[in-house]
Curated annotation (Swiss-Prot):
Protein's UniProt name: Putative transcription factor SEF1
Compartment annotation: Nucleus
A biological-process GO annotation: DNA-templated transcription
GO terms under cellular component: nucleus
Keyword Membrane attached: no
Cross-referenced Gene3D superfamilies: Zn(2)-C6 fungal-type DNA-binding domain
Residue numbers carrying Phosphoserine: S8, S263, S806
Compositionally biased region (Polar residues): 1029-1050
Skewed-composition ranges (Low complexity): 150-169
PANTHER family attached to this UniProt entry: FINGER DOMAIN PROTEIN, PUTATIVE-RELATED, TRANSCRIPTION FACTOR SEF1-RELATED
Taxonomic source organism: Saccharomyces cerevisiae (strain ATCC 204508 / S288c)
Length: 1148
């Protein structure tokens, strides 16, 4: 009972005590957990909204970590006691928003100010250390074994005060810097050590730093270094992400960079230590090695030692960070290194000047004052500028080496890491406008570079102009940033439209505010733009003179703004014609194309009238190219022929004008220096003219001119320096090679071009790029027929049946020009080895606007040809038959290949039978009939042939001038020699230099000399006949004038006078087929073209007793040599696009 009473008393006491404490707890709960009304009435007091008691101190609450303040009360929590902070539990405490960020900014500013103070007084510390013995020993030890640290930034010697020792000042003036960019051998995306211990990162830091020391430094003090694996690459550092978080939360690689930049940077071994300079009268130059990813022993070059009289360089390894690598453009940099390429500061500045003056005006998306400043802004942009400027070098050695290195550097910079700089997008755009070397279309990285630049620019906010702060705070700063960011974004728009048009792909860029604003504003003054690009001193003045209103930053150079307006029209054109949802190929329905294209064409003409495109040749060429694309849309399959007819003449006139404008540009520029949008315009013109000469829709008066323009483009493309032509493969060589293959198709299988109706008949899903792919298909199809006679026979039968049941009257009906199957397709004089070292292109523009090109051998080519002729033929007089395999009589050809011209220049009627050569050095050297050289008659003696020999070796430039890549008719006449290497044995004195086409004087055209294969060469041709043949080569007919004959086996009755209008005979196309020793089973193969059927056996047995080849066989060998790869069975040469792995069976 007592126990129970005691328990009951305790219960009463507990209940009474509980009752007393209950009001206090209720008050506390009401204070901490207010009612709904109280929360509504006091919603502004944020401290009243706590849903649970506060048990953590203010510091732990801010960092959201566990706190034991309630258990240790009244003592501070463990963390505050360890760090020494004031521990307080305050439920009403709330930090102000942005206060921590402001504190961080203040800390950064304070660190920068202290750092500037230390740098300004570096000589004082050196002087003090030299006063004590320990300081001298420390300096000597550190000087012998420097510790390279990432994040190294070389201070500007010009910014240091003059106070201090004279030795230190002299060292600053004399020190030189070699900056080097390293490429990793293989990407290292994952780090081996992922621990968070700071000591581990310190050890890894020391290991990776020592790994890049010179071998001599490693041998002197290797015991104190941390052991590392010899072949382990250093961890990959992000060169653009700013360590704005705590180092504990950073990835391992960035923690290492953070540790290096914040701990080692303020030590005597740090990057700002004056020890990195020289402390003795014998100055040692400093090497700054800027690395993206360092391979082991990557810095084995430029071995440096202390106090070396040769002033070698001591390495200081650095990695790119958000802080500029070279704060001042006046730093004493004397060398830039990438891989095995080393560029001195003088050469870098020269290449920089070449780029700014010769390349940047074509695509003004950036500005730069000197090479050092450009390198400090972006290494990728710097090396891209150097690469592009190397296009002007006479030798492509450096260009070829840099191209592969820069391709790898671009991949590492953009794919492995995430760049935070507009300069990266600018570098990618430059690589798009002046593409890297490539053999096939699919090998070209330009379109992928455009897409990458566009994606990066979206991330950087380039499409939103002034709202850069809403995208990232870690971008590389640049002067007048919004202006150049806007130009870069507009450059992406233009490059994407240009490459989409080249590849025949739909563009993805759309018109936005920045584009509309730039197009609506006026042109920027050229003087201001030049100041941006060239003069650094005038840059500040230009900024002060900028217009105060906002629109000044949207103003563009006149040419760039006009190019953007054309690109904007291209986007509209592609969207209207090639973005249909009602057809599987995406094209507008054929019945609506003509009307739509007519409206768009008028809009383009109005745009040209408003913006005056003709004021600039570069803009005018691109305008004409856009106009050609409008015509090309009309040539796509299923477009009615009646709707195509108006665009055929317009396409011809536009394409020939592009050829003429390109010829004018090449008077002052090299072809390889021109941007891709100009070269693409010329390429597209050549391809469309090649197609137009195959269609009956082209008027006869334009036929010769179209073919001559194709020859001109090919010769301008091939007539490059030998070193560039043999070492660099790009769009220039690819286009020239493609034209040569198409020419070979004209020889071997011309029916491939005319089996289908229409100008573009087999491709349709590549927009205007279908023209290129259609011609590529023809090359592959002809080669397949060449290798498979059975397939060729089936294809011909199938085409004949299809033609029989076709209802297209324009292509099948008889007219003044005959049906398309009755038309004779003649090969073009396209030569693939006419480099500038051996030939010079003499161009002339006729009054009708056609540019005609004539090849003239150089002095060196004639000398080599004579030496080769003596070696092969054993002639003592040094007779010359050909130069680089090209018969001299064919050098003057500008239209179709003509057989008689191979022998018309010989004075002996038995030259052919006696196997005489085509050109004899003992004879007079005259000019081609279509040359622009003045004519001077040289008296010849029939008794003494040696009396008229022209010593074109000793006379030098007076006979064979030192020409550039081309010569136009604008050159003064007195600069030309009186006699130049030509094609005929006697000078032509009665031929006018003004050779016009049949366009201006419509006359009945004669047959091509290709038709008149004369088998009786005993008749001697006079000079007048030779001249008539040359003049008629520009006005030959594509169709016979006399009635056709179903049997053309009696070719020995051909009239010997090739200028006669009675010549009605045609050579069979099998004349160009393989000889019997190559493919004997084709000797009696029949070729069917229209109603004419001939056999090749009639022309394979005309060799004489001396086994002399007929003209047909000579041309066969010549074109086989020109088209290497067809006869040998190597199909890789035909793969312009990259279709070698695709199905090329009949169903393709």
């Amino acid at each position: 009972m007592v126990k129970d009473n005691r328990d009951s008393d305790q219960d009463q006491d507990f209940s009474s005590a509980h009752m007393k404490r209950q009001p206090e707890q209720q008050q506390l709960q009401q204070h901490q957990f207010p009612s709904k009304k109280q929360r509504i009435s006091h919603h502004d007091d944020s401290h009243q909204i706590n849903h649970r008691p506060v048990t953590s101190c203010t510091h732990c609450r801010q960092h959201k970590i566990k706190c034991d303040a309630s258990q240790n009360f009244p003592h501070p929590c463990s963390r505050c006691e360890k760090i020494g902070l004031h521990c307080e539990i305050n439920p009403q405490f709330r930090p102000k928003k942005g206060s921590q960020l402001q504190l961080l900014r203040q800390d950064v500013d304070e660190i920068k100010s202290k750092l500037d103070t230390l740098l300004a007084n570096d000589s004082v510390f050196v002087h003090l250390l030299q006063q004590i013995p320990m300081g001298n020993s420390l300096l000597n030890k550190l000087n012998l074994h420097p510790t390279p640290t990432p994040g190294t930034i070389i201070p500007n010697p010009d910014s240091s005060p003059s106070s201090g020792s004279p030795t230190s000042s002299a060292a600053q003036r004399d020190s030189k810097v070699s900056v080097q960019t390293y490429l990793s051998r293989e990407p290292q995306l994952l780090q081996a050590n992922q621990g968070s211990n700071t000591n581990k990162f310190k050890a890894n830091n020391e290991a990776s730093s020592h790994m890049t020391l010179r071998a001599s430094s490693l041998a002197q003090d290797s015991k104190g270094l941390v052991a590392t694996e010899p072949n382990k690459l250093p961890p990959l550092l992000n060169d653009s992400a700013l360590p704005n978080n705590s180092k504990e939360s950073l990835p391992p690689a960035l923690q290492m960079a953070f540790y290096k930049n914040n701990s080692a940077g303020n030590t005597p071994n740090g990057p700002f230590s004056p020890i990195q300079k020289t402390y003795s009268p014998h100055t040692t130059s400093t090497t700054v090695t800027t690395t993206t990813n360092q391979p082991p022993f990557a810095a084995t070059s430029h071995v440096a030692t202390n106090n070396n009289a040769d002033r070698t360089k001591t390495p200081v390894v650095a990695t790119t960070t958000t802080m500029p690598l070279l704060p001042s453009p006046h730093a004493n940099v004397d060398e830039f290194v990438l891989g095995d390429i080393s560029i001195s500061i003088e050469k870098a500045n020269r290449l920089h000047h070449i780029f700014v003056t010769r390349y940047l005006p074509y695509f003004p998306i950036m500005y730069s004052n000197n090479a050092t400043e450009l390198y400090s802004q972006s290494q990728l942009l710097f090396w891209t500028v150097m690469l592009t400027a190397c296009l002007s070098d006479p030798e492509p050695t450096m260009y070829c080496k840099l191209s592969s290195l820069i391709k790898q550097l671009a991949i590492e910079t953009c794919w492995i890491r995430t760049p935070r700089s507009t300069h990266i997008s600018q570098a990618l755009l430059i690589l798009c406008i002046w593409p890297l070397p490539n053999q096939k279309v699919l090998d070209d990285c330009s379109y992928r570079f455009v897409g990458l630049a566009k994606s990066l620019s979206y991330q950087l906010g380039l499409h939103r102009g002034e709202f850069i702060s809403e995208f990232t705070r870690t971008q590389t700063s640049m002067p007048n940033a919004e202006k150049w960011r806007t130009r870069t974004w507009l450059g992406i728009f233009f490059a994407e439209l240009c490459w989409a048009s080249i590849l025949g792909l739909p563009p993805t860029s759309q018109t936005d505010y920045l584009l509309e604003k730039a197009l609506s504003c006026g042109d920027e003054e050229s003087e201001e733009d030049n100041n941006d690009s060239i003069d650094n001193n005038n840059n500040d003045k230009r900024n002060k003179k900028d217009e105060p209103h906002v629109e000044s930053k949207y103003k563009l150079p006149g040419s760039f703004r006009r190019l953007l307006s054309l690109a904007n029209f291209q986007a509209k054109l592609s969207h209207i014609i090639g973005s249909s949802t009602s057809s599987p190929d995406g094209l507008l329905e054929p019945k609506y194309r003509a009307e739509t294209l007519s409206i768009l064409g008028k809009e383009l003409d109005l745009l040209a009238k408003t913006l005056n495109f003709q004021s600039d040749d570069t803009v005018n060429i691109y305008f004409l190219y856009v106009k050609l694309t409008v015509c090309c849309f009309a040539f796509l399959p299923e477009t009615p022929p009646t709707d195509q007819i108006p665009y055929v003449t317009e396409a011809y006139l536009t394409a020939t004008k592009i050829v003429t404008l390109l010829n004018n540009l090449l008077e002052t520029h090299q072809l390889i220096e021109l941007p891709i949008y100009i070269r693409q315009a010329a390429t597209f013109s050549a391809l469309i003219l090649f197609k137009l000469q195959l269609t009956p829709l082209l008027p006869d008066k334009y036929f010769d001119s179209a073919r001559q323009s194709v020859v001109t483009i090919h010769r301008l493309y091939r007539n490059q320096l030998t070193a560039w032509a043999t070492s660099v493969e790009n769009d220039i060589s690819r286009t020239a090679s493609m034209l040569e293959k198409l020419n070979f198709v004209l020889i071997m299988h011309p029916e491939v071009f005319v089996e289908e109706d229409g100008i573009i008949s087999r491709m349709r899903s590549h927009l205007t790029g279908s023209l290129f792919y259609d011609l590529v298909w023809c090359v592959h199809e002809a080669r397949r027929r060449e290798m498979d006679p059975e397939y060729n026979k089936q294809a011909l039968e199938k085409a004949a049946k299809k033609r029989k049941f076709s209802s297209n009257g324009i292509y099948n009906g008889t007219s003044s020009t005959g049906g398309i199957t009755d038309r004779k397709l003649y090969p073009l004089p396209l030569y693939n080895h006419i480099s500038r070292d051996d030939f010079e292109t003499v161009t002339k523009t006729t009054p009708s606007g056609t540019t005609v090109t004539t090849l003239v051998p150089t002095k060196n080519a004639l000398k080599q040809a004579e030496k080769l002729a003596k070696t092969n033929n054993g002639d003592s007089d040094g007779s010359i038959m050909e130069i680089n395999g090209i018969p001299l009589s064919m050098l003057g050809e500008t239209g179709s290949v003509k057989f008689q011209s191979l022998f018309a220049n010989t004075s002996n009627s038995n030259d052919y039978n006696n196997n005489r050569t085509l050109l004899d050095a003992s004879n007079d050297i005259s000019i081609p009939s279509n040359s622009i050289y003045p004519v001077a008659s040289v008296p010849a003696s029939n008794n003494n042939p040696q009396s008229t020999k022209v010593d074109y070796y000793s006379n030098g430039p007076s006979v064979i001038p030192d020409l550039s890549m081309k010569r136009s008719v604008s050159t003064p006449v007195n600069h030309f020699p009186a006699s130049v290497p030509g094609l005929r044995n006697h000078p032509v004195g009665n031929l006018s230099n003004n050779v016009t086409l049949g366009i201006d004087h419509p006359i009945p055209r004669e047959h091509s000399n290709l038709q008149n294969v004369t088998m009786n060469y005993n008749n001697q041709f006079s000079n007048a006949n030779a001249i008539g043949r040359s003049q008629s080569s520009m006005s030959h007919s594509r169709t016979p004038i006399a009635s056709k004959s179903n049997n053309m086996t009696d070719l020995h009755s051909v009239v010997s006078d090739p200028g006669s209008s009675k010549s009605t005979a045609y050579p069979p196309l099998s004349l160009f087929s393989k000889s019997n020793d190559i493919n004997s089973n084709k000797t009696n193969q029949r070729f069917s073209t229209g109603t004419n059927t001939v056999t090749s056996s009639n022309f394979q047995t005309i060799d004489n007793e001396n086994n002399v080849k007929t003209p047909g066989n000579k041309l066969t060998d010549f074109f086989q040599q020109q088209s290497a790869g067809w006869i040998e069975g190597n199909s890789s040469n035909d793969d312009f696009f990259g279709w070698f792995d695709m199905n090329m069976e009949q169903g393709f």
